UniProtKB/Swiss-Prot annotation:
PROSITE patterns: PPR. It holds the Pfam family PPR. One of its GO terms (cellular component) is chloroplast stroma. Residues 50-69 have a biased composition (Basic and acidic residues). GO terms for biological process: chloroplast mRNA processing; Group II intron splicing. Residues 23-69 are annotated as: Disordered. The gene is EMB976. The keyword Repeat applies. Keywords: Repeat. Belongs to the PPR family. P subfamily. One of its GO terms (molecular function) is mRNA binding. This is Pentatricopeptide repeat-containing protein At5g27270. Transmembrane segments: none annotated. It comes from Arabidopsis thaliana (Mouse-ear cress).
Length: 1038
């Protein structure tokens, strides 16, 4: 209101004595005039002069305060109360210290206010009227209750009493009594008070009647009264009445305040009447009412909700230009609007501006920005924003978590996506189908179709209804694992939700094509055409591929016509190429028409060639090929068509096209020739491969790819000499066939025992500085190791090291074997140390290799230590490793360690098989540990392991060599006792032993006793026996 009186008054509250606020600096030291001692009185109170309550006595009495000190204390208390009142806001309960004229002071004393805001009679009247609210309605008459206040209350006092009421009935009754008083005079002020109180409790009908009464008594409503009425309508959602009343106010040219407009705008926006908010805002601007921060917040939000981007940004800019700092919700509105409008740079700029203001974004704003970063594939920014959310403790809802799962999936962080999904489930935030499907798609993209289907199954068990999109994802899963039945079931379920989309139809058609289900594919195309599914270009391509593969010329022609009529695809290169190449021979000037096509589609040409080849129409095929070679794309298009046939496994068509091209005298590209040669090599068609190779060499020198494929074909067909010759020839010409081809060739030569040729290739690679990769160097080193060329292997390794090619674990393992075989144990140890420092995972193979060379070098402590280290690192030795350890320990006469190793094998589930004990017997025999060898044979027999000639032959041979013929004879007899018939080798060995020892007679006796009856025409045994008889001068008895 404009009244000075009402603006100078505040709400009535009971008198409350506030406690003093303690302060460290609140105590004031007052010096006495006669002493330097300090006292600390209460600075906020003065003596009331009451002799019955004297001040406390002190040791040293205080002198009376001077006038200056009294004024200073009064001012201090005034400042304190002023500060307290400001801190309490509009509900301040402390009296206001004001300056009064002498006349006002006289009136103040007459009112007997005693420091209160109103006089005692006014306070009493307020309490009396308020007290009526506790009585039953109609039980008391206001005239009777207020009879004691007649002629005591001025008009202003009555307004104060009216203003301080809380119940609408008391307001109504008191206002009626007030109008009967002599001091009453009709005023817009008093009517405004009544309107405000009625409006607060929703008595709109009574407010309207009061407003009409105000007009009838001749009071012209001002801006405050009209604003009060408008706020009442707005508060209680009477928008139609509010806008009607607002039009009436405009007609009276009453200028409303900003707060009234804000009230109306806020009320309209709460009910989502954003169009009316905008209209009211424009009228507000037209009236020249200055908006404040809250006004702009409402208007920007309504513009954003209506999708008016330019207007919202303009209002937002005006808001900032006036010095207002937008709230987070305002920034969020314009950011979201910019993202929806596709103005991504503006959205990012607004977000960065908001962050520069120190405003922490809400999770809705973060979700909007994450969606933007996801659309623009700016995944690092998205993850950075998510990290900021965690740092600022902004709660991530399910929408945000779903976006992060998708982003993790796009980045290949499948484990992180799974962790986020599980965390969302743990927090009980997992409820939306989109989150489940996001996780399912991540699993699908990672190739884990089973997990993708598990997520969808989880949705079903939790009674989450499957949407159309869920069936699409299910179809993609089943199509990927080629489960036709389930895919068809998912497609039928999708069809029940509406017309299937082109992408899903394409998935089904591709599934039928991959599984060569031609009849199903044709039936499916027919059905979706009947259902009038909207084809996209990809679905058209797949359908055309089916028709061409099945040789359905008529259907293909109809499909081309259909594509040519559709505005969405008729300008596509694929469609244009098909249309132009359908009937080349029968069309006049077809060559010119095709040349007018800016670019031919390779896939379309391949389909047409496929169709004509399937049809057997060679004339059309030749015409298409001739035409393609005359276009701007030249041979590259044809070569890509041939390559596509090879990739799809349709080699016969590729061969046919290649034959036609050669007969027509046209030239294929090297990559295509190399591809076909490789195919011929895999099929062992060396004659055809050589024909293509020679055709390629007629025009120019074959390139690397052709030579590489030809060498590979030679190797596959077993023509290693030709492969070797081609490599050496190409190397002389400076052509490098590549590391892979060299590896294949050297490996093949090594396996066939052609070590000289392998060495020549290795030397050539070093001399010509041919670039090799890790696998290539490994192959050469291994080949030289097997050829026994240890120095060459060492040179290759040094070249590999100086060239900066990284070593693999195979490199280190092979070099340990090279230096170990060359008795260079120190270098082998150095290589093993390099392998440790490389950071590569050391496997059982390299440990076993190093342990073996330690054993051969006599360093058993190092071998045992390394074997223990291998086990500590979690590598469980296999049977070969244990056999090797048993062998080197037995050789070094470490019998205790051998027993422990055998026991460890049994504990770790490594079976001590025939080879284990055979190795042990051979080692014992070779190292002249005959007793241990015999014990081992006995142990094998006790374990029930079947014995063989091999177990005895090595021991028998060692005993014979040592001249221990009696032990040898005993071993021979044990063999017979074990049920093993000695073979010719054992017989020869023991008989030669008798001859060597010069004891021919014993040899003859042993022969006649043990062997003679079992010799079956063995000429080698017979020869030894003949020598025995000659030695004693006897003739052999026949």
């Amino acid at each position: 209101m404009k009244s000075d009186f009402l603006t100078s008054t505040t709400h009535f509250n009971p008198s409350i004595f506030l406690p003093k606020i303690p302060s460290r600096n609140s105590r004031i030291s007052i010096k006495s005039s006669s002493s330097s001692s300090k006292v600390r009185p209460d600075p906020w109170s003065l003596s009331d002069g009451n002799p019955e309550k004297p001040k406390p006595r002190y040791e040293r009495p205080k002198h009376p305060l001077s006038d200056d000190d009294a004024r200073r204390i009064i001012k201090k208390k005034a400042q304190y109360l002023s500060t307290l009142r400001r801190n309490q806001g509009s509900q301040a309960m402390t009296p206001k210290w004001i300056k009064r004229t002498p006349e006002q002071m006289v009136q103040y004393l007459e009112d007997d206010r005693n420091g209160q805001m109103y006089g005692k009679h006014v306070v009493a009247a307020i309490k009396t009227v308020r007290g009526l609210s506790q009585r039953r309605q109609g039980s008391d008459d206001m005239r009777f209750v207020m009879s004691s206040f007649v002629a005591k209350l001025s008009f202003r006092d009555m307004c104060v009493v009216l203003k301080e009421q809380r119940g609408w009935r008391q307001v109504r009754d008191f206002f009626s009594w007030m109008k009967l008083q002599l001091s009453y005079r009709p005023s817009v002020v008093v009517y405004t008070i009544v309107l405000r109180l009625y409006g607060q409790v929703g008595k709109i009908k009574m407010a309207e009647e009061t407003f009409l009464e105000m007009l009838e008594v001749g009071c012209e409503p001002d801006a405050v009264a009209c604003g009060t009425m408008l706020c009442t309508y707005a508060r209680w959602g009477r928008h139609s009445a509010m806008l009607t009343f607002y039009k009436a106010v405009q007609e009276r040219r009453i200028l409303l305040s900003t707060s009234v407009y804000n009230f109306m705008l806020s009320s309209l926006q709460k009910k989502s009447f954003h169009g009316k908010v905008i209209d009211l805002w424009l009228e507000m601007v037209e009236e020249g009412v200055p908006p404040n921060e809250f006004t702009y917040t409402l208007v920007v939000s309504s513009y954003a909700k209506q999708g008016f981007k330019e207007e919202a940004l303009k209002a937002f800019g005006e808001m900032k230009s006036l010095g207002f700092v937008p709230e987070e919700v305002t920034y969020s509105s314009v950011i979201s609007l910019s993202v929806k409008a596709g103005d991504w740079e503006k959205a990012i700029g607004l977000y960065e501006d908001m962050r520069s203001q120190g405003i922490v974004p809400s999770n809705y704003t973060c979700a909007t920005m994450l969606s933007l970063y996801y659309k623009t594939e700016n995944y690092p920014k998205a993850l950075s924003l998510f990290a900021d959310m965690e740092r600022n403790k902004i709660p991530a809802d399910e929408v945000i978590r779903g976006l992060i799962i998708r982003i993790y999936g796009k980045l290949g962080l499948f484990h992180d996506a799974q962790s986020m999904f599980e965390e969302t489930e743990r927090l009980n935030l997992l409820a939306d189908e989109k989150t489940y499907l996001a996780m399912s798609q991540v699993h699908l993209n990672s190739g884990n179709v089973v997990k993708a289907l598990d997520v969808i199954e989880m949705m079903k068990t939790r009674d989450i209804p499957l949407s159309r999109f869920a069936y699409i994802v299910m179809l993609q899963c089943y199509a990927k694992i080629q489960n036709v039945d389930c895919a068809e079931e998912a497609f039928r379920a999708l069809s029940k939700t509406g017309l299937p989309d082109a992408s899903s139809c394409n998935d089904m058609l591709n599934l039928y094509t991959r599984l060569n289900l031609g009849e199903k594919a044709k039936g499916f195309i027919k059905q979706i055409m009947v259902d009038q599914v909207h084809f996209d270009i990809e679905l058209y391509k797949t359908a055309m591929r089916v028709y061409c593969k099945e040789g359905m010329v008529a259907e293909a022609q109809d499909l081309i016509v259909k594509m040519g009529r559709e505005a969405r695809v008729k300008d596509n290169r694929f469609v244009q190429t098909l249309a132009e190449s359908m009937h080349i021979v029968n069309k006049h000037d077809k060559h010119e028409a095709v040349l007018n096509v800016s670019q031919l589609d390779v896939m379309a040409l391949g389909l047409m060639l496929n169709l004509r080849l399937k049809e057997g129409n060679l004339n059309e095929t030749k015409a298409i090929l001739n035409l393609m070679f005359k276009t701007d794309l030249g041979s590259s298009a044809v070569n890509r068509v041939i390559s596509s046939f090879v990739r799809e496994g349709d080699v016969s068509k590729a061969e046919m096209i290649a034959d036609i091209i050669i007969r027509l005298g046209l030239r294929m590209e090297e990559e295509t020739i190399a591809t076909l040669i490789a195919v011929y090599g895999r099929q062992h068609k060396l004659k055809e491969a050589k024909r293509l190779y020679l055709a390629a060499g007629e025009s120019k020198t074959p390139g690397k790819s052709v030579i590489r494929s030809m060498i590979d074909a030679y190797v596959r067909c077993g023509w290693l000499e030709d492969a070797y010759g081609l490599f050496m020839e190409s190397a002389e010409k400076g052509c490098d066939p590549g590391a892979v081809t060299i590896s294949i060739l050297v490996n093949a030569l090594t396996n066939r025992g052609k070590h000289r040729e392998a060495e020549h290739i290795s030397r050539t690679c070093l001399e010509k500085n041919i670039e090799l990769d890790t696998v290539g160097y490994n192959t050469l080193i291994k080949a030289m190791l097997e050829a026994g060329k240890l120095q060459c292997a060492s040179e290759i390794y040094e070249r590999m090291h100086t060239s900066g090619v990284p070593c693999s674990i195979q490199t280190y393992n092979t070099m340990i074997s090279v230096y170990g075989r060359g008795l260079q144990l120190d270098k082998a140890i150095e290589i093993f140390s390099n392998a440790r420092r490389s950071g590569l995972y050391l496997d059982e193979k390299i440990y076993t290799n190093m342990i073996m060379h330690y054993g051969k070098g006599g360093k058993m402590s190092e071998a045992l230590s390394l074997f223990s280290e291998m086990q500590k690192k979690g590598i469980k030795p296999g049977t070969p490793s244990y056999n090797m350890m048993v062998k080197i320990c037995a050789t070094s006469r470490l019998h205790h360690e051998v027993d422990e190793l055998l026991q460890a094998m049994e504990r770790n589930g490594r079976c001590t098989d025939l080879s284990t004990y055979l190795t042990l017997i051979q080692v014992y025999a070779e190292s002249s540990q005959f007793a241990e060898a015999e014990k081992t044979i006995t142990l094998v027999k006790e374990k029930g392991i079947p014995l063989s000639h091999s177990h005895f032959s090595s021991l028998l041979s060692a005993l014979v060599k040592a001249g221990m013929m009696e032990e040898a004879e005993r071993t021979y007899c044990k063999m017979s006792e074990a049920g093993i018939s000695p073979d010719s080798a054992c017989k020869r060995t023991i008989l030669k032993g008798y001859m060597t020892c010069g004891d021919a007679e014993k040899g003859i006796l042993f022969y006649e006793k043990m062997i003679r009856s079992s010799v079956e025409d063995d000429r080698f045994v017979s020869s030894v026996v003949e020598d025995l008889y000659k030695a004693v001068g006897k003739e052999q008895d026949v």
